Amino acid sequence: GFPAQEDGAASLSGGNSGNIIVPVNGGGDFLLMAHMDTPRSIKGVKPQLLADRITSDGTTILGVDDRGGISVILWALRQAVEQKKAIKPCTLLFSVCEETTLAGSMFYQPSAQMTHGFVFDSHLSPGKFVSETCGAIAFKMKVKGRASHAGVAPEKGVNAIQIAAEGMRNFPFGRIDACTTANIGIIGGGTATNVVPDTVELEGEIRTDYLDQGEQMMQAVIADFEAAAIRLNGSVECAWHWDFKPYRVSPDNTPYKRMEALCRHLSLEMEGVKSMGGSDANNMNAKGLPTINLGVGAQYPHGTDEFILYDDLQMSADMALALLTEI
C-alpha cells in the first residue's frame, strides 16, 4: 500500500475530516484529485445498477459527484499495482468541502516540486475538460435602520427594507455579458407588519473572468448601498471575498499537453471548455499549479435523477490509469 495522511483542513472548514493526501512513490510533480463531500445528503442511498448506467432509486442523489472521481483514481491505482505496472511518482488528494466553500483545496498547499494537476470532477463526458472558468465574489450586506411603531410613529423609524430596495435599484441582476453575471439570492429582515424594520441582511455574488472587473463591480454595489443608507439616514455594512478566482490553462501548459496525448492514446475526441462554475481546480491554479478539471460523466449532478454511464466510468478510469503509468 501507500501511506496516507490527513491534514488540518477541518480547522478551516469546521468539518470533522481533513483532506486525505497520498504521496505515491515520493509524491512526484503532479496531482490527481477528487473531492469526498457530496452536494446533498446521501443517507439511505440505494444505487440501482441498470443496463447501461448507475442511478439512485430517485429518493436521494447518487453522490457520483464526486464519488465517481474518487472511484476511478483508486481503481487506477489498484490496477497499476495488481498489473505490476511502473507507477509515476505523483500525489493523490481527496479533498473536503468542495461543494460549499472549496475549503479543502484552499487549505492544501502543493509542494515545491509540483508542476501541474488533474481534477476528476466535471460532469462533462470523458475527453472533455474544463480549461478555464470565471471567478466568483461572494458578498453579504447588513442594512441598518431604526425600529419604530409603523402606525403610531412611523416618522421616528428608518426603514431598512426601503434602504435595501434603494440600494438594489441599480444592481445588475442576471447576465451582464458573456463572461459576467450577478445575483442577490438571499434577503431577509423585519419582525412584524406593524414595526418599521431596523435590519435587513442579504447575500449575493458576482461572477466574472477578470479580477479587476469583479472588484470594481463590487465597489460600485457597495457605493450604491452606502448612498441609499446616507440618503435615508441608515447605515450599511458589507463583507466580501473571492469564493474562487478565475483561471485559464492554455494549450502550451503541461496538463493541456498531457490531455492531448491522453486522448490520442485512448482514441478520444478532446475538447477544452469554459465553465461558469468553480471547482478545486480554481484553487490549485490560484496557488500557481496549472490544473484542469476532467470530465467523468456524472450526469445531472446534485439532483435525484443523477446517473453515470458504465462506459463513461470505465473510460475515466482508463484515463486515470494512463496518467499514472503511461502518459
Language-model region placement:
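Active-site metal-coordination/substrate-binding segment of hydrolases
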Residues: 6, 13-94, 111-114, 315
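Structural motif
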Residues: 29-31, 52-54, 90-91, 115-118, ...
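Short beta-strand segments
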Residues: 33-35, 93-95, 118-121, 142-144, ...
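Acidic-glycine-rich active-site phosphate/pyrophosphate-binding loop
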Residues: 37-52, 129-142, 261, 292
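Glycine/charged-rich beta-loop-alpha catalytic/anionic-binding loops adjacent to active sites
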Residues: 49-61, 142-148, 266, 298-302
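Acidic/histidine-rich catalytic neighborhood of metal-dependent amide-processing enzymes
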Residues: 58-138, 176, 182, 186, ...
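A short glycine-threonine-serine/GTX helix/turn-capping micro-motif
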Residues: 127-130, 148-155, 191, 246
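Metal-dependent amide/peptide-bond hydrolase catalytic core
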Residues: 142, 159-327
